[in-house]
Structure formats: C-alpha cells, structure tokens
A protein has these predicted regions:
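Glycan-association/targeting regions that enable binding to alpha-glucans and other polysaccharides
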Residues: 1-124
Length: 124
C-alpha cells in the first residue's frame, strides 16, 4: 500500500458542542480552485439512519455549509465526513487519520439547558 501523504487541501473544524434544540451548521473549506472541483459532498447519518446520506453542495466561493435542524430531524447524534472530487479524478476527504483513512466525526446532540447547568456546576 502506498504511503499516505497528508495534504491540507480540505479543512473542517468540528463544533465543540451541538444542541438538540438549535439549528447548527457543518462547514468545510477547500483550497482547490472552483474550476478544478467536480463535486463537494457531506456524508452524514444519525442514530435514526443506519446508512450515510449524501448531501452534494453547490459550488460557491470555496465555502460549503450544511444546516441541520434537529427539530425537523430529531437525533441523539450525528456522524459525518466530507469529500471533494476533482475533475482530474482525484478524491480528497476530511477528517482522515495518519494513514489516509476516513475517520468520520461523531457528535452527540445535547440538551442546551442540561449542558449549561452542568457547566455552571463545574465552575463552582
């Protein structure tokens, strides 16, 4: 197997906390020219979906954002990753591990009131 070389061409910073009562955004940035990009996609699943759902983005100024409304699609957690395919056939993804394998992010959707109550208790 060829050795993986990490090239930071696709960037995503997971949010620290996601709430089950508020719309949140999953955003990815890419360092590729829009002329080189064939498709940018988010793949996500929740505890209510056993398979990943693909959300293809429209090309727009290197900013790709997906809004998730937990009130419309209730879930306990969301697992996701992003892919970028180029016109030359190359494929990139984020997040990946040191071997280049996709390592999806899993974030639990928390109750905001309970989260801030526990956080306040920790400060006291």
């Amino acid at each position: 197997m060829p050795k993986f070389s990490f090239t930071p061409k696709v960037f995503h910073q997971p949010a620290r906390v996601l709430f089950n009562s508020r719309i949140f955004e999953l955003e990815v940035f890419t360092d590729f020219s829009t002329n080189d990009i064939k498709q940018v996609s988010l793949f996500y699943k929740t505890n209510t979906h056993s398979r990943f759902i693909e959300h293809p983005f429209k090309k727009n100024a290197k900013r790709f954002v997906f809004s998730y409304n937990p009130k419309e699609m209730p879930a306990n957690y969301i697992t996701y990753f992003f892919t970028v395919s180029l016109n030359n056939g190359a494929m990139y993804a984020t997040p990946v591990d040191s071997s280049g394998f996709v390592t999806p992010v899993t974030k639990y959707l928390l109750d905001a009131a309970e989260y801030y109550k526990k956080r306040a208790e920790l400060k006291n």
